[in-house]
């Protein structure tokens, strides 16, 4: 079971004409609408309506643009499951717009997280399981070792990309030979949570929630 499947709905929402479909915003770092119903036809009809609405949706105040220079940006990652005999769909709102500051994407892991994760966020990761580059196994072990020995992280090409992050960990965590690798792994998990936050089109702030509600309200 993926973490997203266990995540609860934190705010119920309603769509006119779809009273048979329970809908809500999921408590998750990315922006997710969950639909649940026994009526598969109504569920898929509403999901399609949300997808089409999102594809054409622009909200400049929230930095969401359906298109720039003719290139479409909005899409949805859908995740389907059965839950206690009901059909359930999680619709994850995505947007691939880029800017000079974020050439790989505004809603993509930002530069400061690239030492851990630079690649695109795929379906498995959206659901809460980190798929991390193989290079990290060796690199994180080297980071842990240098933290224990108090060695210079910038002097070794394996640890140099992680130096800023590791030095910040060193300031707030007690590192011992016994716990060093575990601490580094825990901190890597926190970076992955940040990766998902960066990929979320609506941030988990009051402003972000308001903007999310604006989108939901205009779905027709």
Predicted regions and their residues:
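Active-site/ligand-binding surface loops and adjacent short beta/alpha elements
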Residues: 34, 38-80
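N-terminal start-of-chain detector that recognizes signal peptides
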Residues: 5-7, 62-65, 97-101
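Catalytic or ion-translocation cores adjacent to nucleophile or general acid/base/metal-coordination motifs
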Residues: 1-48
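Generic, low-specificity signal for short hydrophobic/alpha-helical stretches with a mild N-terminal bias
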Residues: 15-17, 28-29, 73, 108, ...
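Flexible loop/turn segments at secondary-structure boundaries
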Residues: 9-11, 41-43, 71-73, 98-101, ...
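General "foldedness" signal
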Residues: 15-16, 47, 64, 68, ...
């Amino acid at each position: 079971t993926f973490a997203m499947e266990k995540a609860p709905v934190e705010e119920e929402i309603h769509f006119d004409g779809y009273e048979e479909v329970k809908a809500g915003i999921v408590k998750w770092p990315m922006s997710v609408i969950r639909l649940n119903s026994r009526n598969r036809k109504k569920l898929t009809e509403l999901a399609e309506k949300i997808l089409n609405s999102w594809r054409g949706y622009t909200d400049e105040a929230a930095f969401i643009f359906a298109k720039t220079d003719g290139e479409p940006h909005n899409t949805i990652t859908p995740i389907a499951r059965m839950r206690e005999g009901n059909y359930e769909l999680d619709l994850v709102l995505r947007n691939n717009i880029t800017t000079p500051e974020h050439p790989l994407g505004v809603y993509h892991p930002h530069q400061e997280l690239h030492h851990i994760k630079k690649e695109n966020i795929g379906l498995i990761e959206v659901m809460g399981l980190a798929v991390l580059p193989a290079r990290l196994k060796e690199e994180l072990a080297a980071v842990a070792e240098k933290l224990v020995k108090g060695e210079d992280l910038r002097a070794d090409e394996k640890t140099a990309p992680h130096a800023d992050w590791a030095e910040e960990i060193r300031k707030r965590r007690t590192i011992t030979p016994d716990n060093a690798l575990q601490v580094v792994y825990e901190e890597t998990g926190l970076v992955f949570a940040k990766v998902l936050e960066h990929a979320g089109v609506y941030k988990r702030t009051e402003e972000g929630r308001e903007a999310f509600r604006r989108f939901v309200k205009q779905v027709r």
